[in-house]
């Protein structure tokens, strides 16, 4: 039985990571634009709370983000970040062009939102995992996912050289999907992503950084950097205390790039 809190429109399951920041961002935008209400519930994956019976009822895939929509007669669960973005955008008729009147624009936005989940997110996430959370050095994995991160960054920079926003001429869920990962570049040159190498991405960042909801996400990311702890996550993959407490296998800044 899904726990209900009738005081809010949505229950949002999060752990303050890139994929969950996408959903927090659209919820903040909808809070301002449509006066929706939501409650955040933190799922601590280092304590394996995502495997709890309660959470598995929400998402059988055992991952965040997920939301429970309580605005209807019965609570309705949506999981997978881009699925949530599309669901909310369609429900409130915002951040996604209407298919009936603008089918091509609608398709462009959805394509770039799905592109993020299928390409940018996996490349960034896997490279970051093998850089900081892997108990041992995996050189092949590091180079493979670094090269893929460089490829998707170059592709996105090319896209933004001809389009003000990722999905077209207006801010959309395509931007929200990528923002969950790319807002980190405001604080550190992760993946060697600098303004000199990817000027159009940073121009886009300057543009969306002006939004109030984005400012709030940036604040959360800034606070997260202060408490970054690879050891806690490494403990999910090994019981060896030496590996858990070892220095990260390789620093982001030391990776050899092949797409300079």
Swiss-Prot record:
Residues 102-233 form the GST C-terminal domain. GO terms for molecular function: glutathione transferase activity. Pfam families: GST_C, GST_N. Residues 7-96 form the GST N-terminal domain. GO terms for cellular component: cytoplasm. It comes from the Eukaryota. PANTHER family: GLUTATHIONE S-TRANSFERASE-RELATED. Belongs to the GST superfamily. This is Glutathione S-transferase domain-containing protein DDB_G0274223. The lineage of its organism: Eukaryota, Amoebozoa, Evosea, Eumycetozoa, Dictyostelia.
